[in-house]
Amino acid sequence: MANPVPSACCVVLAAVVVVYAQRHSQQDSHIQYERVGADVTMKCGSMDWDAAVTWTANGTDIDDSHLNGSYLILKNVDLTQSGQYSCYEGSSWHLKYQTYLRVGVPPKEPVLMCRSNNYPKGFYCSWHLPSPTYIPNSFNISVIHGTREMVCEKDIFPKNRCHIRYLQLFSTVKYKVTLTVTNALGKNSTTLTFDEFAIVKPDPPESVVAKPVPNNPRRLEVSWQNPSSWPDPESFPLKFFLRYRPLILDQWQHVELSDGTSHTITDAYAGKEYIIQVAAKDNDIGTWSDWSVAVHATPWTEEPKHLTTEVQITETTSTSTSSFMPPPTTKICDKGAGVGSGAVAVCWTAGLVLAAYGVLFI
């Protein structure tokens, strides 16, 4: 006879699967987008208006004051009310409806910028929104040169950027770039029109170094390198703009250099720390780069020497002389030491004492 236990287990398991399938077939789960400040009404799936239901938000029961029959009413929603909302039937707690509420705003006009930092290879365009929407956005960009639509290859990083390769150099035909941003609550767009030469802007110079010039207290030697992104400095040379100032002042001094990647500052204040930056630009077209990373340097200063003053010499001589003077000799009687009979008496007394000692030793 077959064991009835496995058969019973199979029946129970089948029943669980059927109930699970029924519950999920009865529920409607999706994402619902609403604007900040809107009034939101949620219906509990196919349940009647007067059905007994329970609503939860992120697993927490919602007070009945927000219900109109079986409908959930949310007034003037804000960002904090985003989350998962679920509706259950009566006391059985059968899930009848589930939605994820996303509260946000439609996009404002995007900020679009196009620039060529590797001329003549091509240019790139980057964009961002002036303020967050709090919900997902999608961006679409189109680039048209004359009657030709060009491909803008999206960069992996940063994600809101793409680059375009020049198909024709020195063209007088303008480029037209249109960016459209869309989300579940609306869309917006912006357009740029420009000449090829107008967007040329190199990256800042690299490896800027400033150091003092030996034996020159008013000079600083500054050197730098072309930006590594500039592909052909021989055919498309750069010129440079140097600015510098001592930290004690706010006013910059400037020098424009048409060639070379070094310069000697000759009017620095001796002993004062300087801050120095360099910018770059194509010799003929485009605009100046941003400033390089600031470097600091101080002009050469002479090592202080030990100077001995005349007073120090006198004191040293006096001290040395006194240290080698013989100790004073005590005299029994000095002719000029005493004044009057008192002094004479002292001398005679001392003489008699010495004479007495002499007699004893004879």
Curated annotation (Swiss-Prot):
Residues glycosylated per entry: 58, 68, 140, 188
Compartment(s) where it occurs, according to its Swiss-Prot or TrEMBL record: Cell membrane
Any GO BP: positive regulation of cell population proliferation
UniProt-listed Pfam families: fn3
A cellular component term, taken from the record's GO annotations: external side of plasma membrane
Lipid-linked residues (GPI-anchor amidated aspartate): 334
Domain annotation Ig-like C2-type: ranges: 23-103
The UniProt record lists the keyword Cell membrane: yes
Protein's membrane topology: Lipid-anchor; GPI-anchor
Chain ranges for the short sequence motif WSXWS motif as given in the UniProt record: 288-292
Disulphide-bonded residues: 44-87
CDD domains to which the protein is assigned, alphabetical: FN3 (cd00063)
Organs and tissues of expression: Highly expressed in nervous system. Also found in skeletal muscle.
Organism expressing this protein natively: Gallus gallus (Chicken)
Domain comment quoted from the record: The WSXWS motif appears to be necessary for proper protein folding and thereby efficient intracellular transport and cell-surface receptor binding.
Signal peptide: 1-19
Domain of life from the UniProt record: Eukaryota
UniProt-recorded Gene Ontology molecular function terms: interleukin-11 binding; interleukin-11 receptor activity
SUPFAM superfamilies: Fibronectin type III, Immunoglobulin
UniProt protein name: Ciliary neurotrophic factor receptor subunit alpha
Keyword terms: Cell membrane, Disulfide bond, Glycoprotein, GPI-anchor, Immunoglobulin domain, Lipoprotein, Membrane, Receptor, Repeat, Signal
Propeptide: 335-362
Entry similarity comment: Belongs to the type I cytokine receptor family. Type 3 subfamily.
